[in-house]
């Protein structure tokens, strides 16, 4: 049933692509047949819903095959076995190339159906073109699923009694939600991309498509960011090397579209308010989708080495052709409609909020280009010089850290700038508090013993950002308090709820500050390694870890070598750490490291078991990782900010906005 549903879905998507294009084109002339146009559009809409239904059937069939351990399917055999828990059997759905493509195709069909349901009445002129773009994308993925990478291929020969099993590294709770979260971000951003192209193809220069798809942009950006953080956390607790970000090509593949999507999300505000940055916005969303497909190409082509990639496959060529086609189509549409995209207003001052947003676009684009260059450099060097030169973390840090510091200053200053006007009394009135907090932040970092320049600057600029957010909240709250005699704390809550988009954005900035602080702790990491016997100790900083014992713990599907250490801080016992090495059935050559962490707001005490001996000796890697918990907490704050920003507005909006309308 699953294979049949996939095949029918492919032909339905091709049909939907064709009739959507015909319906969009049929309304171009004054003599167009209105009833024929309506019929074509209605037919394309039915194809969208049918495509979603068929892909749901196919996905349910594959999921059922995993849950019942149907090893007659090659894909189920390769990624599951009978000892695998049902939770990880679900994870196995997207553990391999075929299943992850099916998950992508299903999510794309779901988003297309939801977008059609939500927007077909609000954007009737654009919907046929958007349907054409979405169904064209769906056709591409269904082409791969049916003819290149089929998830329902039969096992060659007699059905085996058991499967090979899931990769041990993927048997982690984070892997249950990390890939789907990333995919929601990737696929969700297809919607604003489709409507942007629709606006170009339909000749619409207004910003209604931005207004209608804003929630898609914000929510997809959030899920993509959460997916990146979940991936970092998985690397931190599962890989055992002590860090969370290695500038691996697949890590970079998710970061690049997040950077350009961040620029797009901010830049569209200027188009909505001032009728500016139209070419910027079209280019940013086109490049965002291009980078999404480029990242998929990296993951599936095997051309660029990565510990996260699926390995070499024939899919790489298909994605290479597809990503350049969508890039050429998008850029050609921008060039074709360039006169329509002329700005309605122009920058009136180099020191205004509009100029700050322009600089924001440039900075995020520069960051994305740097990551793109570093990721592709090994391939480019091999093509041009015959030698594959790998770019390490040092390159990314040297180039990106200064750019990121400039970005932090911009985030801190931008809310204080006025629209259109040059620097005036507003800035000089509002800037002293953020500057004072910035100085206190730098002094506090230095007084705490930090001597790393970048870390001190991050602490300083983080305080600057918090100061500017505090000023904005205070000014809005005091205006409401004076107007309605409401107590200041309650006024602050009311003003945030009355302008949720704006103040939700400020809460997101607070979350980003926490993430910046967490990242700033990376240069301060301390590490010690050693091999000790039971009752011996290793020391690092003001911690002492006493090795208690080693146990061999067999379970149904694995053997765990478990060690137990007692941790002391300045002579006081603070807890136990239990790092492990695990050996899974059928995967004995792929042992996993299960680290143990004692965490607080200041630092993580991180221990990995790197080796062991039958006589009880054990080798450990012990690290003090400062401020890591700030990363994860920052993600929660960003979630609150996004929730506030996208929550439906009240009908009666109370304005206590500091900046006013332009």
PLM region spans:
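Carboxylate/His-rich catalytic cores and anion/metal-binding grooves
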Residues: 123-158, 190-226
């Amino acid at each position: 049933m699953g294979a049949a549903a996939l095949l029918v879905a492919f032909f339905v998507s091709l049909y939907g692509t064709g009739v959507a294009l015909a319906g969009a084109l049929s309304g171009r002339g004054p003599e167009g047949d209105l009833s024929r146009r309506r019929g074509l559009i209605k037919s394309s809409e039915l194809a969208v819903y049918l495509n979603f239904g068929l892909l749901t059937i196919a996905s349910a069939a594959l999921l059922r095959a995993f849950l019942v351990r149907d090893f007659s399917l090659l894909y189920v055999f390769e990624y599951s076995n009978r000892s695998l828990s049902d939770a990880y059997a679900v994870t196995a759905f997207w553990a391999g190339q075929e299943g992850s493509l099916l998950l992508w195709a299903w999510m794309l069909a779901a988003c297309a159906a939801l977008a059609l349901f939500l927007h077909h009445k609000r954007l009737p002129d654009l919907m046929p073109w958007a349907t054409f773009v979405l169904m064209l994308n769906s056709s591409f993925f269904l082409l791969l699923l049916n003819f290149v990478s089929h998830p329902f291929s039969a096992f060659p020969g007699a059905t085996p009694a058991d499967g090979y099993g899931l990769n041990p590294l993927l048997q982690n709770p984070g892997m249950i939600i990390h890939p789907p979260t990333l995919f929601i971000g990737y696929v969700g951003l297809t919607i604003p991309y489709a409507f942007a192209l629709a606006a170009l193809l339909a000749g619409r220069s207004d910003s209604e498509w931005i207004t209608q798809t804003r929630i898609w942009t914000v929510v997809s950006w959030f899920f993509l960011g959460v997916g990146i953080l979940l991936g970092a956390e998985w690397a931190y607790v599962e890989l055992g090397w002590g860090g969370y970000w290695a500038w691996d090509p697949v890590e970079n593949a998710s970061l690049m579209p997040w950077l350009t999507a961040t620029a797009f999300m901010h830049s569209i505000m200027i188009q909505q308010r001032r009728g500016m940055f139209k070419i910027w916005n079209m280019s940013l969303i086109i490049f965002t989708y291009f980078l999404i497909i480029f990242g998929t190409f990296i993951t599936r082509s095997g051309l660029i080495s990565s510990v996260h990639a699926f390995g070499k496959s024939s899919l790489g060529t298909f994605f290479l052709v597809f990503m350049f086609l969508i890039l050429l189509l998008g850029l050609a549409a921008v060039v074709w409609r360039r006169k329509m995209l002329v700005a309605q207003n122009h920058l009136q001052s180099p020191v205004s909020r509009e100029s700050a947003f322009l600089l924001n676009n440039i900075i995020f684009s520069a960051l994305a280009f740097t990551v793109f260059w570093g990721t592709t450099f090994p391939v480019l060097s091999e093509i041009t010089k015959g030698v594959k030169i790998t770019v390490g973390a040092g390159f990314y840090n040297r180039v990106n850290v200064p750019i990121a510091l400039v970005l932090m200053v911009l985030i801190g200053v931008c809310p204080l700038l006025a629209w259109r006007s040059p620097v005036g009394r507003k800035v000089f009135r509002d800037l002293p508090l953020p500057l004072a907090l910035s100085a206190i932040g730098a002094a506090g970092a230095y007084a705490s013993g930090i001597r790393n320049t970048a870390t001190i600057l991050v602490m300083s600029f983080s305080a600057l950002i918090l100061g500017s957010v505090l000023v904005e909240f205070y000014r809005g709250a005091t205006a409401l308090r004076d107007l309605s005699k409401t107590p200041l704390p309650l006024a602050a809550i009311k003003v945030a709820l009355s302008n949720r988009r704006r103040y939700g954005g400020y809460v997101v900035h607070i979350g980003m500050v926490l993430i910046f602080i967490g990242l700033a702790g990376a240069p301060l990491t301390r590490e010690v390694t050693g091999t000790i016997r039971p009752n011996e100790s290793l020391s690092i900083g003001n911690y002492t870890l006493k090795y208690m014992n080693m146990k061999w713990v067999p379970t149904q599907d694995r053997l765990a070598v478990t060690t137990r250490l007692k941790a002391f801080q300045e002579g006081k016992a603070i807890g136990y750490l239990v790092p492990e090495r695990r050996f899974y059935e059928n995967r004995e050559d792929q042992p996993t490291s299960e680290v143990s962490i004692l965490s607080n707001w200041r630092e993580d005490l991180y221990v990995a078991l790197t080796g062991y001996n039958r006589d009880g000796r054990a080798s450990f890697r012990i690290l003090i990782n400062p401020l890591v918990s700030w990363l994860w907490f920052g993600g929660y704050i960003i979630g609150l900010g996004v929730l506030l920003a996208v929550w439906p507005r009240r009908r009666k909006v109370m304005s206590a906005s500091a900046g006013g309308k332009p």
